[in-house]
Swiss-Prot record:
Compartmental location: Plastid, Chloroplast
GO MF terms held by the record: structural constituent of ribosome
Coiled coil location: none
Family: Belongs to the bacterial ribosomal protein bL33 family.
Keywords for the protein's UniProt record, in alphabetical order: Chloroplast, Plastid, Ribonucleoprotein, Ribosomal protein
Classification of source organism: Eukaryota, Viridiplantae, Streptophyta, Embryophyta, Marchantiophyta
PANTHER family, sorted: 50S RIBOSOMAL PROTEIN L33, CHLOROPLASTIC, LARGE RIBOSOMAL SUBUNIT PROTEIN BL33C
PROSITE patterns: RIBOSOMAL_L33
HAMAP family noted in UniProt: Ribosomal_bL33 (MF_00294)
Protein name, as recorded: Large ribosomal subunit protein bL33c
Annotated organism of origin: Marchantia polymorpha
GO cellular component term, pick one: ribosome
Pfam families to which the protein is assigned, alphabetical: Ribosomal_L33
Length: 65
């Protein structure tokens, strides 16, 4: 049986450059879905991933659902 509070949770990562830019030429915000272990990484996750809207590798931060 699963515990009431799962250790491994699904999180969303969002590009910080796209979220802060208000340019009209941007078509959206890059988001990735991944999993993290709450016991090993209790703080918010930051990963460097490719953003298809910025066309470069940028920092993606964990966002609330």
């Amino acid at each position: 049986m699963a515990k009431s509070k799962d250790i491994r949770v699904t999180i969303n990562l969002e590009c910080i450059n796209c979220a802060q830019n208000d340019e009209k030429r941007k078509k959206g915000i890059s988001r990735y879905t991944t999993q993290k272990n709450r016991r090993n990484t209790p703080i918010r996750l930051e990963l460097k991933k490719f953003c298809c809207y910025c066309n470069k590798h940028t920092i993606h931060k964990e966002i609330k659902k």
